[in-house]
């Protein structure tokens, strides 16, 4: 009896430094976010630079500092819990998890839209067939779920292949852009990099950019599966961050130089841009191989976020703030299979809703993306607030960074994160009805937050009798 009470499920340590670097690249750098941002013009380059300096860099500092102070499985959930208490930890983890219920379906949509180009330009119209798109999305969702249940020892290879696909796809895009620039020039002028007279549509991009730069914390969510995390994590964060940031700016500039901003499609924008550029330089044959590489990249993104975020309900299940069976691990593969299955089922429902209950595909995509931005950034309010709390604490306890560094990173990160959340409520130009957009944004966000409150307070009441039972069992064992 006592052995069952004290025994906690464990996950295998299978991730090395370069596994983490590739994980960071495939999780942070998402080529398909670039078109929705670049469609707003050259001014977004300045938003990228501001976000890299005031959000991404502080994020790296926060991940390394907090991972050293609080090593272990759980990431943003564990950090908020240790610094601010149980409820804030649960809310942070809940938002991190539920955001992926909205984000993973958009990844499925990316995959379908891009993969049909691998069959040739004549099959591109298949992406507009709702039945085909839904079936293919659900097949990918099932495959990713199975791979992550089998374990990161297997699933990490999809992440790694996805990272390689990302590098190849980004390299092809940038090289084509450079070729177009030197052979045909560009219509981009200095005025395109100025703030427009009506910046409303550009404002939404700032939240999406911050969302696109999230991902460095993902490895810490898998903290118990990293080999020698104290030595492995800092170098992996540095390399992964530099590579992802450079790829984002390079890809955005390439799109702006090679394609008019009013011709950039939010969905399929990258592969359409490559098709346009490849035809211009006489290498149209690369479209299908490029689509394959980009499809691998998208599959890697889905695998990385599905596997990483599923660790949140796994840990929350262990702490009894959600149904205890979410803390179960697979008897053979030692993975949080229950949490992965629940996440897959919810994502399945959202995929079906996306294809059958939405208006225009681009508008539905933009709504889901904006909702994901809000929920994803909530945990980072806690992350950066934690740095400020450490920075002002007396006496100061130094772990990796100085007081001044923690205060700068905490302040910069907290301000940019708050702005990113607020600006996500500004509608993008794809939105046709502003009031419907605002109602859905506020309503769905509140619904997710109220569900978090429900789960926490209902299961925390159930937790008290469990704790009492454990104490009685320990007393019986001692006597």
Q: How does the language model describe each region?
A:
Residues 1-50, 56-61, 70-73, 190, ...:
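Membrane-interface "cap" regions at the ends of multi-pass membrane proteins
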Residues 10, 158, 326-334, 377-430, ...:
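C-terminal membrane-solvent junction of multi-pass transporters and transport-like membrane proteins
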Residues 11, 45-46, 122-132, 160-291:
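Helix-loop-helix junctions that connect adjacent transmembrane segments
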Residues 36-40, 57-141, 146-149, 295-312, ...:
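Hydrophobic transmembrane alpha-helices that form the core helical bundles
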Residues 78-79, 85, 117-123, 236-306, ...:
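TM-loop-TM module centered on a large, flexible mid-protein loop between adjacent transmembrane helices
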Residues 95-110, 213, 218-225, 248, ...:
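Membrane-helix boundary/coupling elements in multi-pass transport proteins
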Residues 113-118, 164-193, 252-261, 380-395, ...:
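Hydrophobic alpha-helical segments and their helix-loop junctions in multi-pass secondary transporters
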Residues 132-183, 237-242, 373-382, 402-413, ...:
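Membrane-interface loop-to-helix entry segments
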